[in-house]
Amino acid sequence: MSDTEEVEHGEEEYEEEAHEAEEVHEEEVHEPAPPPEEAPEEEEKPRIKLTAPKIPEGEKVDFDDIQKKRQNKDLIELQALIDSHFEARRKEEEELVALKERIEKRRAERAEQQRIRAEKEKERQARLAEEKARREEEDAKRKAEDDLKKKKALSSMGASYSSYLAKADQKRGKKQTARETKKKVLAERRKPLNIDHLNEDKLRDKAKELWDWLYQLQTEKYDFAEQIKRKKYEIVTLRNRIDQAQKHSKKAGAKGKVGGRWK
């Protein structure tokens, strides 16, 4: 219920109370005297003349004063309600301001923490970069010293070692050439697989074809590996036979000669 409705309700109650008081007063004034008791017929007595009792005049009820007091009371209550409302509103505004201040303070603290964290990360990255540069410099210096030592060692060695290095470089070049040739041949054999235009059946056929081809390659690889094993075994066997034959021939030659002559 609003404050205005409370005031109107209070005025209505006040008017009803005043109206009831007036009705009670009128009833007291106009109340008729009780009828006289009927005397018995046998004995007739003289009738007494009855008059309405007079109401003593006392203090008159001032309804205007009552209404003013009631209105003043209602105004005081309304003013108290208004004051309490504004007091609650003031407290809410103070709490809102305090909340905003706490939020701003927390935001500033978080920004400060992020700034400190960023500075520490920057210092860490700079320290890592310095350590990396120092290690690279030390590695380069050590490598230069090793190269200088190698050059001095090579210069102190004779031309035989230089020719040996030249031959080693030549062999390395041959190996590199053979490796490049192998890569080239494999690149020519290994053609790109174009299957974008194939449907499901053709893809299934293509997969089966590739599987068969892979199975054949694995079979050939296994056969070649077995052939290499057999060849190695045969070579080792032949070498052992040659070594045994050479040993026997040396022993037989030593026994056949006596004093540099044959027996």
Curated annotation (Swiss-Prot):
Q: Which Pfam families match?
A: Troponin
A Gene Ontology biological process noted in the UniProt record is: skeletal muscle contraction
- GO cellular component terms, semicolon-separated: troponin complex
**GO terms, molecular function:** tropomyosin binding; troponin C binding; troponin I binding
Alphabetically list the UniProt keywords: Acetylation, Muscle protein, Phosphoprotein
Q: Which SUPFAM superfamilies match?
A: Troponin coil-coiled subunits (SSF90250)
Task: Output compositional bias ranges, type Basic residues.
Answer: 247-263
Give residue numbers for the modification (N-acetylserine): S2
Q: Where is the composition biased (Basic and acidic residues)?
A: 56-66, 107-149, 177-188
Query: Per the record, where are the segments of Acidic residues compositional bias?
Result: 1-26
Q: Where is this region: Disordered?
A: 1-66, 107-188, 243-263
Q: What does this protein do?
A: Troponin T is the tropomyosin-binding subunit of troponin, the thin filament regulatory complex which confers calcium-sensitivity to striated muscle actomyosin ATPase activity.
Family membership, please give it.
Answer: Belongs to the troponin T family.
Q: What is this protein called?
A: Troponin T, fast skeletal muscle isoforms
Q: Which organism is it from?
A: Gallus gallus (Chicken)
What gene name is listed for this protein? Answer: TNNT3
